[in-house]
């Protein structure tokens, strides 16, 4: 089972970015499916089904003291031909949450992939983008059915709850 842990921006945030990109295009460009737009927190790779309870427990424990986190999509970049929107906001809290997760704690650029094909207009639109702020309030464990056509299934989701020992008050 191919797994990753992600934050999913709310529908209105994804729609705003999609509109911004579509408005910038003079010709159609293939974007990734908007309903699957997410910010990967940790890629867990292939895991035997019998390890799912242990993985779920670890992700749930991370969520229990990891948020909520105020974020926004802003700016952009690319990894090869893949184009992405950047993530801005409370990045210290974002990285604290990421550090609580199993695996995936090497070098990392928070991002949301919008296309796997480089396109100058989309790249320019991403660089100029500053989306609305939103609160990440849920951490999701996702099964990627990569071999069966790039579908995603939500395995489990946990509310991001503040760490009671942290002393910070989450902003809504």
Regions found by a protein language model. Name each.
Residues 1-172:
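Histidine-dependent nucleotide/RNA phosphoesterase domain, centered on the 2H-phosphoesterase fold
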